[in-house]
Amino acid sequence: MQEIRIRGAREHNLKNINVDIPRDQLVVITGLSGSGKSSLAFDTIYAEGQRRYVESLSAYARQFLGQMEKPDLDLIEGLSPAISIEQKTTHRNPRSTVGTVTEIYDYLRLLYARVGKPHCPECGTPIQSMSIDQITARVLAFPQGSKLQILAPVISGKKGEHKDVLEKIRKDGFNRVRINGEIRTLEEEIVLKKNFKTSIEIVVDRIVMKEGIRSRLADSVETALKQSEGLVILDDGSKDHILSQKMACPNGHDIGFTELSPRMFSFNSPYGACETCDGLGSLLEFDEDLLVNDPELSLVDGCIEAWAGSKSNGFWFMATLKSLSDSLKFKMNTPWKDLPEKTRQTILYGDKKIKIEYDFRGANSHYEFTKEYEGVIPNLQRRYKETKSDSMRQWFESYMTNHPCPSCKGKRLKRESLSVKVHNVPVDEFTSYSIEKALNFVQNLKVTGAEEIIAKPILKEIHQRLSFLNDVGVGYLTLERSAGSLSGGEAQRIRLATQIGSRLMGVLYILDEPSIGLHQRDNTKLVSTLKNLRDLGNTVLVVEHDQETMEESDWLIDMGPGAGVHGGSIVCAGTPAEVSKHKNSLTGKYLSGRLKVPIPAKLREGNGSKLQIIGAKENNLKNIDVNIPLGKLVVITGVSGSGKSTLINDILYNAAAHKVMKMKTLAGKHKTIKGFENIDKIINIDQSPIGRTPRSNPATYTGLFTPIREMFAGLEEAKLRGYGPGRFSFNVSGGRCETCEGDGILKIEMHFLPDVYVTCEVCKGKRYNQETLEVRYKGKNIFDVLEMTVEDANQFFENIPIVKRKLETLLEVGLGYIRLGQPATTFSGGEAQRIKLATELSKRPTGKTLYILDEPTTGLHFEDVRRLSEVLHTLVDRGNSMIVIEHNLDVIKQADWIVDMGPEGGDGGGLVIAEGIPKDIAKIKNSYTGQYLKKIFTSSEKISRKTK
């Protein structure tokens, strides 16, 4: 069969559609946001592909995977096994890195274990093997009278009962062994748990250092070395000294090297992980800047919020500080910033030499005692360790930040592991390289002789994976980068590279906007990668809005014609050229140039004020100075990884939130920022969910639900029954269904199977009890209203201005199709961001608000971008300021001011390439953004000339 045939697809808003998708082709599904693209691609095609695969498994295997629901459709034929590559950043584990999720780090560990050269952690000298005489001499260096045990390690951290090993030791004539640090005699019956890791060392000899011991010592050392294949452990009662025939420092430093193995380089294994931070590379510690949120305040005013704001101990803490001030002779009403540095350090970290006198007088009691001053931070650390309350733990952690581990300096591994080098490069240095630099290192790595035979297959795997990652446009990422810090687009492209590396054939790949976060320059690489996946013999189905990807596809499906209830149909399907000529296709009109997002005729002058970021040097920023004019739409551009988000989110937003909004945020490294007096509020409108539970919805988030509940409470029927606004809330007792507690569904725990959700039988999913649902407005009860789309509700509430105004803002941002009570968890990142924008639009303007948006065009069609642009312009026209981080040229060309970062990503970025109005940026040759803007302005001029 040459195509995937779909008949009668009705999932979500799909209108009983029929569509044929050619197999082994690059197929793009496009259309307005909410038109049904994901419903077709993921909820129908992928879901059915997955379901059929699971159905083919045995009943035993299926019980662990659960029952998969069949999508609502009549027929689907020609389906291949389906793999979905979505935008979600799934790796929230702090131990996951780019290196681990791509499996490159697994091969690196193998490479360093097999061809790495160990060096002494103390002096850096290459480690050499020791002879028996050298080992004996090292033991003889212990002082006279020292009591030593000479041990031979035979099992090192391996699971099993090890009966045969213990039996052999017994037969060899030894009486004692040390098992997991405990001395045991072989006369007793030793039973080990087979699922637990065990270390076993033979006790070869126990000696006291004295004259004439050399001969006995040499014999014991030789015996130990034979039993353990070249390793001897000296136990002096306080620590173990590992000496090896294979590895020893020629300068005599005591080092703990065992045989090199891959687990030595794993920060997830106790054999490789730094013991201080357990391989995390950082420690959660109390931060001075978070504890003292406002240095302008004094101790009396509560500058140390964690003590001053404590409900239970606030009086005690303030009395402690008052006694300390009497002792150190400082005033409690002096602003924190004006106190001497030594005094501030004493207040925070304590001083055991200082004794505080306490004098508490109550109505019937009087306490007097003296106690050493503990200090704010030691006090909080002690209470943090002692608490068993999750809420208290969270409260403490709000004053804490991650700091690099003092032992491993953030490198995650033990110093012995960090001392192993391949061509003078330790493993931590390799992982600090960008993918592009690591690829270059591997290509130029020369190994010879026996090493070449061992390293060649390992290097081939590393080289392939690095090449695939570089090809999908993430060459600027480092292998040590935390997987949780990746954007959705970056995470998706990494998974895409992994799939290409698997070289599967006959698979249906379904991708969700892989171009997210990519500069136009890197799009060509991505399209080539998708074509490579197709050329392997796969069908590649991409939900995408990027023009270049559409034009390079083999087949284009345009969904619509509108969004939500107005969508769900196939407007047209064909080659990109055929779609661009279709008269009813909105996508076709934009592809052919018949419709365009307009370029503003005039740029804003701004209000004359600006924000000045001076000396920014967080991550890859190169100590740069940047001016952000206020009262304008400012767009930050640059290739992926050039430092845009670091500059705006990590430095500017965090600094402004701390200074202006008094939030507990820590800004990235910079010298200073000037101009905060020109703004009174800063709002980061990101793509995070509007709520974490199904109880959150657009009505609750935008504030619509309150006036709607008040309106219902004001109805005659509600007044007669004595119902207030709370009666119409599903979050509190009274009007909600108590069986499901207002959820409408019940969760049934299935233990080893996934939880099952069933509709509540009492309220039939309506969330409210019968009495509440009897109160109606225009024939509709509160449940009916929550089920309405924004578009329907706008007509329904046309006579209630406060509700209508909020609904109109949702319509303005193109969300007329969403339901008022739609669970927050069902919205895409782009939809969540536009709900937040609508909420801001409905507020009264102050004219001094700074808005920050990071890639707001994610998930948006050309037409959605045009609508979004109008909303952004409306907010700026009210006198506010806006900073947008964006790659979409339709937004960039509308900017009043552009800051272009680069020139490359990662180490090659972090500089300001150009600042100015769009037409000036277009003239700058070394600006990648400028090169693409130049094409747009040249094209627009040609069209305007033809029009004239």
Curated annotation (Swiss-Prot):
ATP binds at residues 31-38, 638-645. It comes from the Bacteria. A zinc finger (C4-type) spans 249-277, 737-763. The keyword Isomerase does not apply. GO terms for biological process: nucleotide-excision repair; SOS response. GO terms for cellular component: cytoplasm; excinuclease repair complex. Residues 307-586, 606-934 form the ABC transporter domain. It is found in: Cytoplasm. HAMAP family: UvrA. NCBIfam families: PRK00349.1, uvra. This is UvrABC system protein A. The lineage of its organism: Bacteria, Pseudomonadati, Spirochaetota, Spirochaetia, Leptospirales. The gene is uvrA.
